[in-house]
């Protein structure tokens, strides 16, 4: 037997305060553009999809930085350690030698920006040499076409299809006058002829206070359709 308070709460129209589960992230279907919808990967984020399609999610630089591309990262340390200590020592020596050789190759003065420098060290950490950069950030004598060709990235197939879609001519659809509008224009023409000023001040027919220019455009279109020659 429940108490009076419980029975009153059950009859009340106010819902009970239950625990609210976390809303699941809704996957929105891309319907605005058929080309993007056909190439959209729902397992990726919006920024990742835009990058894959060759587009930009934001015109400006993102404030929080960019997502690191881990596909190009080469791990030099093995995931599992070898069983034998001798093999481990040999692998460590090979890794150090590879790191030293890679550092030697990467230090190119023509690839380092002007005003910066890179320090090259040996296996013990001692400074071997300092490489000063000679790469200019902007060369005024450089050809503009070379700069554009260097900065432009290769267009993807999706971008080419979108550009082809955008370059299609737009077919202009002419507005057709309704039957009621034609009847209204016919009444105005029979009453005032080509005097658009009187049409403008006609309070009974021009109830929506259409301007003289608007009335003239409508009547010229109506005359052209009905084959009426202006006086």
Curated annotation (Swiss-Prot):
Phosphoserine sites (modified residues): 178
Localization per record: Nucleus, Nucleolus
BP-aspect Gene Ontology terms: ribosomal large subunit biogenesis; rRNA processing
UniProtKB keywords: Nucleus, Phosphoprotein, Ribonucleoprotein, Ribosome biogenesis, rRNA processing
Residue ranges with Basic residues bias: 1-10, 17-27
Region (Disordered): 1-30, 77-108
Bias (Acidic residues): 85-98
InterPro entries on file: Ribosome_biogenesis_Nop16
CC annotations in GO: nucleolus; ribonucleoprotein complex
Top-rank taxon, per record: Eukaryota
Role of this protein: Involved in the biogenesis of the 60S ribosomal subunit.
Assigned protein family: Belongs to the NOP16 family.
Record's subunit section: Component of the pre-66S ribosomal particle. Interacts with NOP7, RRP1 and RRP15.
Protein name per UniProt: Nucleolar protein 16
Gene name, Swiss-Prot/TrEMBL: NOP16
């Amino acid at each position: 037997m429940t108490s009076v308070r419980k029975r009153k709460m059950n009859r009340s129209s106010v819902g009970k305060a239950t625990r609210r589960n976390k809303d699941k992230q809704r996957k929105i279907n891309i319907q605005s553009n058929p080309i993007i919808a056909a190439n959209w990967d729902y397992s990726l984020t919006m920024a990742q999809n835009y990058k894959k399609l060759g587009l930009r999610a934001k015109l400006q630089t993102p404030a929080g930085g960019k997502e690191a591309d881990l596909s190009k990262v080469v791990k030099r340390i093995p995931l599992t350690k070898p069983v034998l200590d001798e093999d481990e020592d040999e692998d460590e020596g090979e890794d150090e030698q590879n790191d030293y050789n890679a550092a030697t190759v990467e230090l190119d003065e023509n690839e380092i920006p002007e005003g910066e420098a890179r320090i090259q060290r040996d296996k013990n950490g001692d400074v071997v040499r300092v490489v000063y950069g000679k790469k200019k950030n902007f060369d005024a004598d450089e050809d503009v076409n070379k700069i554009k060709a260097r900065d432009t990235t290769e267009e993807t197939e999706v971008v080419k299809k979108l550009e082809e879609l955008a370059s299609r001519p737009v077919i202009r659809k002419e507005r057709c006058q309704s039957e009621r509008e034609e009847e209204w224009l016919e009444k105005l023409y029979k009453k005032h002829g080509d005097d658009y000023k009187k049409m403008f001040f006609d309070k009974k027919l021009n109830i929506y206070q259409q301007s003289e220019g608007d009335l003239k455009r409508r009547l010229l279109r109506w005359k052209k359709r009905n084959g009426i020659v202006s006086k």
